[in-house]
Amino acid sequence: GLLPKCKLVPEQISFILSTRENRNGVFLTLDSLKKGGILNKSDLSSTQVVFLIHGFISSANNSNYMDMTKALLEKNDCMVISIDWRNGACTNEFQILKFIGYPKAVENTRTVGKYIADFSKLLMQKYKVSLANIRLIGHSLGAQIAGFAGKEYQKFKLGKYPEIIGLDPAGPLFKSNDCSQRICETDAHYVQIIHTSNNLGTERTLGTVDFYMNNGYNQPGCYYSFIGETCSHTRAVQYFTECIRHECCLIGVPQSKNPQPVSKCTRNECVCVGLNAKRYPKTGSFYVPVESKAPYCNNKGKKI
């Protein structure tokens, strides 16, 4: 009985709901939401909703996701729903057993994806949330979950999510899969991928835009080891939070044998990483130089 269970039933999934009125958030379940009375407004038609999804051996109240939630709320009067599927992510298992549970956590990603699709449909039906105002941001296994949520939502024949942001999507047991078994550019109208590690993540292009931070691996300030790999993998979340928090734009240059310097960038061929990426005309793969310390800015204040 020592093997990690990493069991997940949908009833165990909870979430932290945060708004400008309640920035610290409250832990809730879908049952409590269905009974009503939690959202004090019944009409959320003008509210932006962001689903945030953690990765393997993590949880919704991990400081990196709390920081991103704060940054999102400072920038927009939105509602952040940080999904907590820690039981299924092996977070509660014995330290030494956590990693053995990874394949089970991978299986659980589909359950969580379906949960999010159902949840978003409920928000639209019961609270008048507009599909155009929904965005999913997932890290690691959470990015794969966001992709599965996008696929599940499309089964309702009600359209597609406008945007999914995959922060260093998990590579192991996904990277050689075809589109139906991993996050894919068809999961939303615009799929933005940030690559920061090539062992825990993948260098494979997956989205409408793929940003390769520092070539997509060995992030500055992280070291060459398993710890360094974890550090690089987590950097994706930190980079994105800084892109939300600061007007500083991390500029992506189209990938080529010798990418042009950021200083030569214009709006038409380069793209800023972040919530406004889809406003730029260019899609494809981009190289993003980064600094080793927050806000990781690469552009000396240049705006494009």
From Swiss-Prot:
Disulfide bonds join C6-C90, C179-C184, C222-C231, C248-C272, C249-C297, C265-C270. SUPFAM superfamilies: alpha/beta-Hydrolases. Pfam families: Lipase. CDD domains: Pancreat_lipase_like (cd00707). Keywords: Disulfide bond, Glycoprotein, Hydrolase, Secreted. Belongs to the AB hydrolase superfamily. Lipase family. Catalyzes the hydrolysis of phosphatidylcholine with phospholipase A1 activity. May act as an allergen and induce hemolytic activity. This is Phospholipase A1. It comes from Vespa velutina (Asian yellow-legged hornet). The lineage of its organism: Eukaryota, Metazoa, Ecdysozoa, Arthropoda, Hexapoda.
